[in-house]
């Protein structure tokens, strides 16, 4: 009970109080009046303490002692009266409202409400603590279940590891057998290779000896002149001068007979003789001289034939014989007979041969190409051959034949098979029917086109070759890379990649300085980046935008522009570049720029022609620069002219891959930096840690049957569900426990300061130290202290507030609080203390008032708990003993921590008063400003004058300004006044140096003698308003927010089955949406279809 006997004197009540039956005025529960109440209570308790009426009065929440014989009490909503009569005391629990005035009754109800709130808070706190303990018990039980599940899974894992070892052993044995088989295969291959090599050499020897030709005596080379050999090769003829050059005074030269023109040689010889001899033309002596000269130059003529000419003549004769044989076969239709025999031989069994022979006879009789029957004998089963014969005889009944064949084959496959074979048999039957349809159409086409037999065979072979070749080219092969990774690709893809790589290598090898190669431009990968200091070029790599550091230097937010879209984005991080004064800035990629194509890193970095993708000076139109670039020590040097705003632009090679980034121009040389190695290290691919486990499970799965796998999956799925339920329950309990603790702490904070401290101390003793103190209570005093030190060392390591020895003693021996608790209890709030200071109370007067309030609280506590004051007269000695034990505990805790090598001190949180001499704070909408001064005691008065000038008398909105001046014990706090921050300036008189650091906050440091410093720090913070992102719809052109996908669908033109024309949803239907039966109208086709299917009565 909060004994409110001292709070119910109506004479001191303010005049502006509400009626008793109205709402209780705020603040009445804080009023108290101690004048004479204590003496009156002592007198009445001494006179009526044993009377039941007095005990009934003391059971009330609030008691008002009117005089020595009359008292009024309030319990819940009832007002009772205590009276002293001559024959005794009486207590009436109801009906005493008439004895109080309206104001006194309001006081009493306010005090009663306070007591009820306290009782309800204590009950709620106890309930919450009980619920928290139950939740903690359930959490412990759930964790035990989780540990059991973990143990079961551990057993499963051990079993899996054992199975893995067995599989590994079996795999090793299989590999050994495979190596043995490979050796045997190698031996056989070696023998086969030697045999093939022998036949190759034999063939080459035969060909070599066949090409040799016979020689005779007349084909021997003469000692003087040339040897003429017969030949029909088409070569140009020789002149007389050529013959002289080759055959005069030479040995062993050979001339072909096709090069010798006798008439031409005689004519040219006579002309040469007339010219050199100087005689007249036509002199007979010249003819004789020329004939003798030619006989001398060409003395021998060889008339032998070579093997090639003999072989050619024999081949021509063979071809003539083959042509005559073919004409004979065509005349007597012997090709059909050959095909007949060939088809009969292709039959795989006797039944098929018996069924194919009639088909061949029918084909010969009906003049059907025998090649078709040959193909049918190979691809069709015996059961479908009757349908093949029917199709040969009656080609016009193809649909009926296919229908009957389909029914017959499916029924036969169903009734003749069972189990898994049933599906295979039915599928095979359907394939046979499809082949029958294709074969029948092919027969009709061949009959109509009258294609020769040879052409038919070639057509069949070509079709088979193309189909098999395409299938082989598209087949998948497994490529094993040197790092152990495997990749499945098709043969066509592999060949295409190899050719592309080879072409790229050839292209790079042909790159010559001076000839600029053509390459793709990457304008679709760059954007404009604007910062506080200027603008530049950005480019996309993976899922980020990158640019140079000096483009956005000093900017936390940058603007990215691309065409008509611009977004303001926060910088993600800054990457340092090796041996470079500039940096690389990474900006996150937003959803508005997902269409920007990313760049890929170059595979090879070397001196070559590079392309710089950038913007023109207007930062709208895109431009590219291309030229020879030299790479040296990670930097790129080029000689082409760049412009302002090209910083951050990417360098790409002839394949469009990223090489580096442009930094700027110095004179006639432009400089960039290579980024390939930097970006590779910044975005390392995460290595998979479960590849081996997956491979082991795959190998294990190949050894397990399908049924076993399904059983194991069901079992594992059940265990996973159990784990999920346990985890969900654990999370739920932890969440409930957290909510309970938060709600409990919030409830405790609502209590008054004095009761809160008592309740917290009691809860701490009951919850945290109960189990520990029960063990310590049985120890001797010295061992108790050592045990307490161990407990407090662990609490100090965890950062918890050290519990005093007073608390421990209270939990061990005392049942009630001592007076020492009330001697340090806080009785005044900051508002009450400031009010008393403003009213002119001195510190001694305030201390006296606080001591009286503490004494009154102590007396109320004694009355509520029915404790005599003589029961606890040694409270002062207990307080001194507690302080002594505190010091001993601190000393032992620090010594224990030092022995462990751990720090014994913790960082103390400094308040505004502890931080600086002056602290000014101004809060306004959109921006706020703070000023902080730290100085030496010699200049406190000078800064105090600045503080008084800075704080103006104009009032501001509550909570918008704070001014604090703290010098030793003197502290001044002024709120909600206009503050001029410019009045606070550093006092530099006598300072050695004055330094100013103009960063985000302007800091001025003045250094005096003995390195003493005064620091004045002023900071203005402006709220950054992000620019609203706007995006124009490409379909309708509007900028208002709406679903762009739905808008695009509504504007897409499609064929409408109802209207019979192409239109979009926006254009609407050209035909009214009415039911053809009942003429009911609808808003869309879906409603009309639903009506026609379900609700239309006439349909």
UniProtKB/Swiss-Prot annotation:
Q: Which GO terms describe its molecular function?
A: 5'-3' RNA polymerase activity; serine-type peptidase activity
- Classification via Gene3D superfamilies: Trypsin-like serine proteases
- How does it get modified after it is made? Cleaved by the viral and host proteases. The protease is probably autocatalytically cleaved.
- Does the UniProt entry include the keyword Signal? no
Q: Which domain of life is it from?
A: Viruses
Spell out where the chain crosses the membrane.
195-215, 329-348, 353-373, 397-417, 426-446, 450-470
Task: Write down the top EC class of this protein.
Answer: hydrolase
The record ties this protein, via SUPFAM superfamilies, to: Trypsin-like serine proteases (SSF50494)
What are its E.C. numbers?
3.4.21.-
Keywords, comma-separated and alphabetical: Covalent protein-RNA linkage, Host membrane, Hydrolase, Membrane, Phosphoprotein, Protease, Serine protease, Transmembrane, Transmembrane helix, Viral RNA replication
Residue numbers carrying O-(5'-phospho-RNA)-tyrosine:
833
Q: Which GO terms describe its cellular component?
A: host cell membrane; membrane
Q: What reaction is this protein's catalytic activity?
A: RNA(n) + a ribonucleoside 5'-triphosphate = RNA(n+1) + diphosphate
| Tagged with keyword Protease | yes
**A GO biological process this protein is involved in?**
proteolysis
Site Cleavage: list residues.
168-169, 508-509, 795-796, 915-916
> Which residues are named in the active-site annotation?
550, 582, 647
Q: Record's family?
A: Belongs to the astroviridae polyprotein 1A family.
Q: What is this protein called?
A: Non-structural polyprotein 1A
């Amino acid at each position: 009970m909060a004994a409110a006997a001292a709070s119910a004197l109506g004479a001191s009540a303010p005049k502006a109080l509400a009626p008793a039956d109205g709402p209780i005025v705020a603040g009445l529960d804080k009023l108290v009046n101690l004048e004479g109440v204590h003496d009156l209570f002592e007198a009445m308790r001494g006179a009526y303490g044993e009377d039941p009426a007095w005990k009934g009065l003391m059971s009330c929440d609030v008691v008002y002692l009117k005089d020595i014989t009359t008292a009024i009490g309030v319990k819940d909503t009832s007002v009772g009266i205590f009276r002293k009569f001559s024959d005794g005391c009486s207590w009436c629990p109801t009906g005493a409202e008439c004895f109080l005035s309206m104001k006194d009754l309001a006081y009493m109800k306010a005090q009663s409400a306070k007591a009820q709130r306290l009782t309800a808070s204590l009950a709620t706190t106890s309930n919450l603590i009980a619920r928290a303990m139950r939740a903690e018990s359930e959490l412990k039980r759930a964790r035990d279940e989780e540990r059991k599940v973990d143990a079961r899974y551990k057993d499963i894992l051990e079993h899996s590891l054992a199975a893995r070892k067995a599989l590994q052993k079996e795999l090793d044995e299989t590999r050994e057998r495979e190596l043995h088989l490979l050796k045997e295969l190698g031996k056989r291959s070696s023998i086969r290779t030697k045999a093939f090599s022998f036949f190759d050499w034999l063939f080459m020897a035969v060909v070599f000896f066949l090409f040799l030709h016979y020689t005779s005596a007349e084909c021997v080379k003469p000692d003087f002149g040339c040897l003429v050999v017969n030949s029909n090769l088409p070569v140009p003829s020789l002149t007389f001068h050529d013959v002289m050059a080759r055959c005069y005074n030479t040995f062993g030269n050979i001339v072909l007979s096709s090069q010798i023109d006798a008439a031409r040689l005689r004519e040219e010889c006579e002309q040469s003789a007339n010219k050199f001899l100087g005689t007249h033309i036509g002199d007979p002596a010249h003819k004789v001289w020329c004939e003798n000269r030619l006989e001398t130059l060409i003395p021998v003529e060889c008339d032998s034939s070579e093997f090639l000419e003999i072989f050619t003549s024999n081949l021509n004769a063979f071809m003539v014989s083959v042509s005559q044989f073919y004409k004979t076969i065509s005349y007597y239709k012997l090709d059909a007979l050959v095909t007949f025999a060939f088809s009969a031989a292709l039959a795989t069994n006797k039944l098929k041969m018996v069924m194919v022979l009639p088909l061949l006879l029918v084909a010969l009789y009906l003049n059907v190409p025998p090649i078709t029957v040959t193909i049918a004998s190979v691809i069709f089963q015996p059961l479908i051959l009757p349908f093949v014969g029917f199709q040969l005889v009656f080609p016009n009944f193809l649909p009926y034949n296919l229908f009957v064949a389909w029914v017959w084959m499916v029924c036969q496959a169903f009734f003749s098979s069972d189990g898994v074979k049933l599906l295979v048999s039915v599928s095979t039957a359907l394939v046979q029917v499809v082949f029958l349809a294709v074969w029948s159409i092919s027969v009709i086409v061949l009959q109509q086109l009258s294609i020769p037999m040879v052409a038919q065979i070639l057509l069949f072979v070509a079709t088979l070759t193309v189909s098999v070749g395409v299938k082989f080219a598209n087949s998948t092969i497994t490529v094993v890379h040197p790092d152990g990774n495997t990749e499945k690709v098709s043969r066509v893809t592999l060949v295409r990649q190899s050719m592309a790589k080879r072409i790229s290598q050839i292209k790079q090898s042909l790159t010559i300085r001076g000839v600029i190669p053509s390459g793709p431009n990457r304008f679709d990968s760059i954007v404009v980046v604007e910062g506080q200091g200027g603008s530049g070029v950005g480019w996309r790599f993976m899922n980020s935008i990158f640019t140079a550091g000096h483009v956005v230097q000093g900017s936390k937010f940058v603007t990215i522009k691309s065409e008509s879209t611009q977004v303001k984005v926060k910088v993600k991080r800054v990457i340092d570049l090796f041996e470079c004064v500039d940096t690389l800035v990474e900006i996150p990629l937003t959803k508005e720029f997902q269409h920007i194509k990313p760049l890929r890193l170059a595979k090879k970095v070397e001196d070559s022609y590079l392309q710089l993708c950038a913007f023109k000076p207007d930062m709208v139109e895109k431009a590219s620069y291309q030229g020879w670039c030299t790479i040296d020590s990670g930097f790129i040097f080029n000689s082409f002219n760049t412009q302002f705003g090209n910083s951050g632009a990417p360098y790409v090679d002839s394949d469009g891959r990223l090489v580096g980034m442009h930094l700027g121009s110095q004179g006639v040389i432009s400089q960039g930096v290579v980024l390939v190695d930097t970006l590779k290290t910044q975005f390392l691919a995460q290595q998979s840690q479960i590849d081996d486990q997956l491979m082991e499970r795959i190998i294990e799965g190949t050894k397990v049957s399908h049924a076993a796998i399904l059983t194991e999956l069901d079992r594992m799925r059940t265990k996973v569900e159990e784990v999920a339920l346990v985890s969900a329950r654990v999370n739920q309990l932890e969440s409930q426990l957290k909510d309970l603790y938060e709600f409990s702490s919030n409830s405790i904070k609502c209590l008054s300061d004095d009761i809160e401290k008592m309740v917290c101390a009691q809860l701490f003793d009951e919850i945290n130290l109960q189990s520990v103190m029960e063990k310590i209570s049985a120890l001797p005093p010295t061992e108790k202290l050592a045990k307490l030190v161990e407990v407090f060392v662990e609490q100090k390591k965890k950062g918890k507030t050290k519990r005093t020895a007073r608390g421990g003693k209270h939990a061990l021996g005392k049942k009630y609080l001592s007076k020492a608790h009330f001697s340090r209890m806080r009785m005044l709030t900051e508002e009450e203390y400031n009010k008393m200071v403003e009213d002119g109370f001195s510190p001694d007067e305030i201390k006296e008032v606080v001591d009286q309030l503490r004494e009154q609280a102590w007396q109320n506590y004694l009355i509520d708990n029915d404790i005599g004051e003589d029961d606890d007269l040694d409270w002062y000695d207990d307080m001194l003993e507690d302080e002594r034990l505190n010091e001993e505990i601190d000393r032992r805790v620090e010594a224990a921590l030092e022995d462990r090598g751990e720090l014994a001190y913790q960082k103390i949180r400094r308040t505004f008063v502890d931080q600086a001499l002056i602290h000014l704070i101004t809060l306004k909408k959109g921006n706020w400003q703070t000023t902080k001064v730290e100085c030496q005691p010699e200049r406190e008065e000078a800064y105090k004058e600045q503080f008084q000038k800075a704080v103006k008398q104009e009032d501001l909105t509550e909570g918008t300004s704070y001014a604090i001046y703290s010098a030793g014990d003197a502290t001044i706090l002024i709120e909600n006044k206009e503050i001029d921050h410019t009045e606070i300036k550093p006092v530099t008189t006598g300072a050695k140096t004055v330094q100013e650091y103009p960063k985000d906050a302007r800091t001025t440091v003045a250094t005096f003698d003995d390195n003493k410093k005064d620091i004045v720090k002023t900071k203005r913070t402006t709220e950054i308003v992000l620019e609203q992102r706007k995006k124009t719809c490409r379909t309708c052109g509007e900028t208002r927010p709406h679903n762009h996908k739905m808008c695009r669908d509504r504007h897409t033109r499609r064929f409408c089955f109802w209207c019979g024309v192409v239109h979009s949803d926006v254009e609407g239907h050209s035909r009214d949406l009415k039911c053809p039966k009942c003429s009911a109208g609808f808003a869309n086709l879906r409603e009309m279809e639903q009506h026609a299917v379900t609700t239309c009565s006439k349909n």
